[in-house]
């Protein structure tokens, strides 16, 4: 029996503005986000004794601590695999709090991903990954399979072949996200919704992906404060309890290129995450009132819905077409606009939106939301959360 479910909660969220050129260092972005989250929780930097971030983050825990007035650290950790780390940072923070290792842990991610190193350029546009991953890329890069969009296009084309999905089916994900972003003043695409025709007319990046199937490249930072549920109840905001937190890596897992499995149209690592989340929380898909699904590329939203039990394999296209991801639908999704509409902060801004949904303060609040399921990056070893109200 896990000691984790309900033992810890997210009590504070904070972010910088989301832009295309922040004009400041990644360390400054990290510190601004961390301080904003601490203030939102009604705490002081001196209360913090733990920090968690991504292995990809350039702002080390000790430098964030030094520059924010945080003192001694009893817990510090990093989670790997790019966007797959997002919910994993909260899992590690919650485990530290639940076991008494630390009392106040801040999770953060900050980068200049548009004005600095652009992930969209893939391995051709930045220093190549080292170690064993470089050997795996040797089977891809020399043949021109260099960028995340290209890697996902391979998956998307096979999914279309197997289940009859179309570019329009992918486009409906983008339309919903941009609709939600259009009413979110913090979103980059605030007041700029799109139509399915706009999606279809946007230029090809790599078939079958149009430009509007691809997430943004953003500058910004996001942070979250995790404390015990008991302590969170005495802080300013209604706590978002962590009812489930899990990581998952599937059989024959690769980084965005798991093409060697017997069946490549699913994302079994997300299925593994979902199984753990439901088991920990005692919930099932019908109990989930809203979702934040990692949307770096629209095609990968469809198999997430299937792996997590919201619809059967191959039926996500119909689930979406029926309006289920809309504010008034069965599963309001990415109410902040997602990474397509608000910003690409490796999924951390999505966790913050889940907290707002539990608090009842989202700009696109779909009524009372008791439980929110959040996912991290897909195509890589990944993670997920179920956040909910105090029971």
From Swiss-Prot:
Tell me the impact of changing residue 346 to A: 11-fold decrease in catalytic efficiency
Outcome of mutating residue 294 to F: Almost loss of activity. Loss of activity
Please name the GO terms of the biological process aspect recorded for this protein, alphabetically: bile acid catabolic process; lipid catabolic process
Q: EC annotation? A: 4.1.3.-
Which InterPro entries does this one have? Thiolase, Thiolase-like, Thiolase_C_2, Thiolase_N
Q: Which residues form a coiled coil?
A: none
Q: Name one GO molecular function term.
A: lyase activity
**What's the catalysed reaction?**
17-hydroxy-3-oxochol-4-en-22-oyl-CoA = androst-4-ene-3,17-dione + propanoyl-CoA
Q: Which domain of life is it from?
A: Bacteria
Database matches in CDD domains: SCP-x_thiolase
In the record, the note on similarity to other proteins reads: Belongs to the thiolase-like superfamily.
Q: What does this protein do?
A: Probably involved in bile acid degradation. In vitro, when associated with the ChsH1/ChsH2 hydratase, catalyzes the retroaldol cleavage of 17-hydroxy-3-oxo-4-pregnene-20-carboxyl-CoA (17-HOPC-CoA), forming androst-4-ene-3,17-dione and propionyl-CoA. The in vivo substrate is probably a closely analogous bile acid degradation metabolite.
Q: Whom does it interact with, and what assembly results?
A: Homodimer. Interacts with the ChsH1/ChsH2 hydratase via the DUF35 C-terminal region of ChsH2 (ChsH2-DUF35).
Instruction: Please state what the protein is called.
Output: Steroid side-chain-cleaving aldolase
* Species annotation: Thermomonospora curvata (strain ATCC 19995 / DSM 43183 / JCM 3096 / KCTC 9072 / NBRC 15933 / NCIMB 10081 / Henssen B9)
């Amino acid at each position: 029996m896990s000691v984790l479910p309900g033992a810890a909660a997210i009590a504070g969220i904070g972010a910088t503005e989301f832009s295309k050129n922040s004009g400041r260092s990644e360390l400054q972005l990290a510190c601004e986000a961390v301080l904003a989250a601490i203030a939102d929780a009604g705490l002081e930097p001196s209360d913090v004794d733990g920090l968690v971030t991504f292995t990809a983050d350039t702002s080390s825990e000790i430098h964030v601590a030094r520059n924010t007035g945080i003192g001694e650290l009893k817990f510090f950790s990093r989670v790997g695999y790019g966007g797959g780390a997002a919910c994993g940072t909260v899992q590690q923070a919650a485990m530290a709090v639940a076991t008494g290792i630390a009392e106040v842990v801040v999770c953060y991610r900050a980068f200049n991903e548009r004005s600095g190193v652009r992930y969209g350029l893939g391995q051709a546009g930045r220093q190549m990954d080292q170690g064993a991953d470089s050997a795996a890329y040797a089977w891809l890069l020399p043949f021109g399979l260099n960028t995340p969009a290209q890697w996902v296009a391979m998956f998307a084309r096979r999914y279309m072949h197997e289940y009859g999905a179309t570019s329009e089916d992918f486009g409906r994900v983008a339309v919903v996200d941009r609709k939600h972003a259009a009413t979110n003043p913090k979103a980059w695409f605030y007041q700029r919704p799109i139509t399915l025709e706009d999606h279809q007319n946007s230029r090809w990046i790599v078939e079958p992906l149009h430009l509007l199937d691809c997430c943004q490249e953003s500058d910004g930072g996001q942070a979250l404060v995790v404390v015990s549920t008991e302590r969170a109840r005495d802080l300013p905001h209604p706590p978002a309890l962590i009812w489930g937190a899990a990581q998952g890596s599937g059989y024959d897992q690769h980084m965005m290129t798991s093409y060697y499995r017997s069946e490549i149209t699913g994302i079994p690592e997300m299925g593994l995450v979902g199984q753990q989340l439901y088991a920990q929380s005692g919930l099932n898909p019908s109990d989930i009132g809203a979702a934040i699904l990692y949307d770096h590329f629209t095609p990968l939203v469809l198999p997430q819905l299937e792996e997590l039990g919201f619809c059967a394999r191959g039926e996500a296209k119909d689930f979406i077409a029926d309006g289920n991801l809309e504010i008034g639908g069965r599963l309001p999704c990415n109410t902040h606009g997602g990474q397509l509409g608000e910003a690409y902060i490796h999924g951390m801004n999505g966790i913050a939106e889940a907290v707002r949904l539990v608090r009842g303060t989202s700009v696109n609040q779909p009524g009372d939301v008791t439980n929110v399921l959040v996912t991290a990056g897909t195509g890589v070893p990944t993670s997920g959360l179920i956040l909910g109200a105090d029971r």
